[in-house]
Every structure is written in C-alpha cells, then in structure tokens.
Curated annotation (Swiss-Prot):
Stated name of the protein: Protein-arginine kinase
InterPro entries in the cross-refs: Arg_Kinase (IPR023660), ATP-guanido_PTrfase (IPR000749), ATP-guanido_PTrfase_cat (IPR022414), Gln_synth/guanido_kin_cat_dom (IPR014746)
Taxonomic source organism: Clostridium perfringens (strain ATCC 13124 / DSM 756 / JCM 1290 / NCIMB 6125 / NCTC 8237 / Type A)
UniProt-listed SUPFAM superfamilies: Glutamine synthetase/guanido kinase (SSF55931)
Swiss-Prot/TrEMBL catalytic activity: L-arginyl-[protein] + ATP = N(omega)-phospho-L-arginyl-[protein] + ADP + H(+)
Domain Phosphagen kinase C-terminal: from-to ranges: 12-240
Amino acid sequence: MVQWISPLDNSIVIASKVKILRNIKGIKFTKLLNEEEFNDLLSMVLGRLKEIDILDKCYVVKLKDGEEKIIDYYKENFGLIKYFENKDNLIFIMNKNGEFNILLNEEEHIGIECTNSGLSLREVYSKVDNLDDLIEEKIHYSFDSELGYLTSNIKNLGTALRAKVFIHLPLLSSNNLIRIIKNALKEEGITLKSIYNSGNKDVGNIYEVSNIKTLGMSEKDILDSLISITNKLILREKNQRDNLSKDEYIELKDDILRSLGVLRNTYSIDRDEALKYLSYVRLGVELGIIEDLSLKSVNSAMIEIQPDMINNSSIKKRDIQSLKIERAKIIRNALNT
C-alpha cells in the first residue's frame, strides 16, 4: 500500500509529493535516444543501481510488458493515465514498500519521486535527496555550475525539483475564491490547479499546489515557499468553514448527508457527479459529521472511479453506460464497508 493513502489525521491536506529529474553526463536526452542507445542506458543504470542494493527492494517493470502491475501500484496516485501515453520504453523501478519509485526514460533519464500523507514535503524531500545522493555516487549527472542540473525541458533547469501538495478546498471553491487565489499565487511562483476537470470547470475540489520555478532558488527555498503557501490555504479554507452561519452549516450538513445517501445507493453515476458528492462526503469526514467512514475509503474511491482506471480492470473498453454502472459499484463497495 502506498503510504499516503492512509491519512495521518483528518487534515484537508491529502498528500505531499516530491520528484527530482536527472540526466546522465555524456548521454543524449531521452527524446533523442534510439532503441539501441536506450538499451545501453538501461543496462548501465540498472547495473549501477544494483551496486548500491536498491534493486533488491524494488520491482523493475517495463511499461509495455507490465502495465497492469504498474496501474495497480499507481491506484493510489493522481494523474496516472496521461503519464503513460506513448511510453513504450518507460521503466518503473517501484519500491516494494511504496516508499519511492524511480522512472527511467520518462521526461529525463532518471526521475526519483516519493509521496506521503499530509503536509510532509520536507520528510518526502529528505527521502528523495538521500536516494539521489546514493545514485550520484555511481552515476555522473549532467550539471552546470551556473545553471544547475541540465534538463531537456528548460522549465526544469536548476534544481530540477518538482514539489506538490494535494489539498481539499471545497469551501474556497464553492465561494468562487479559487480563481482569485490562483492569480495571486502565480506572482509568487506557485501554481494552483484542480486535478480533475470537465472542460474549463474544476470538479471534485481537490487541488494541486506546486512550484513553477526551479532555477534561481535552492531546494530549501522551494519547499519553504510551498509549505508557507499551503499553510495559508489551509487557514483560508478553515476560516470559511468556521465562519459559516447556523443556517449555512445546516444546509452544508444536509448536502453532506444527502451526498452520502446518494453514493451508498446509486446504481449508475457519471464521473463529475460522483466527484461532486465524494467531495461533500470527504468534507463530512473532515468535519466529524460522518463518523463511520475513513478518508482512506474516500481517497481510494476518488481515484478508482476515473474512466481509465475502470477500463484498465476490464478485458475490453466499456461503453459509457457500463462505465457509470461499474463506477457506482466501486463507490458502493468503498462507502458501505
């Protein structure tokens, strides 16, 4: 089980994720490699990782040969399927305890990532950094004294560090404050975006807070900035909740319990409607209105009801009606246990 899916507490922060990208000195960028060059790269990297005893604790899976295993592993993660498009040579090195995973030949030669519960960016970064140091003892990275780590995408130059926090902001979203906050955060080098969308509309009220800048800032500066912004978002969301009038609270509680009733008894439901109700249910658990459910159950349901997740578990691609029926079944199983 990936560690973040079981929350540390009833925090509105779901998880923290850190990923660093590295290229190997003297080797062309991933997008420029032919099949033979990729195989040489793979052989070299796996050999070096074996020398530092990383592989003994991991599954090594090539996407085109082991997609089902990778999908199962990533059921506890966000934004999976786009990640997999046209990645025939993508290699996943997945820690058996879910502590980290290494990606070879994705955006860059090497990607190291870790995810954990709550607002835990420093702890997550420490794990990634320690692993990066071990690998760097055996592999020489592409590094420039002025530019930092060299990457094929100029947006990743410098630290090549991407830090993300996943956070539930239903009250800020319902009060139409998200757009204002998004614009303000851009000025501070931070992106706030919904992880689920329907056209131009945010759905599900789960947002990703992440850094834009990787050049001209240290890793510590990036993490400190993101933690500070996240704490401000938490405070603003809690203020919205605390300042509800008596009538507003009664209406919200009714919406929460109605949503739970719908989801526990629905036979067919589309994704956007399901995410809307699951957000209410999650809020109900966070506020203590719903006491017989865990956030783990809600987290799992939100991820497993996505169309690509449902289709992956089926021998053939489902039609729209079949998807809606299976989605309802997944939700009932998650919320009635």
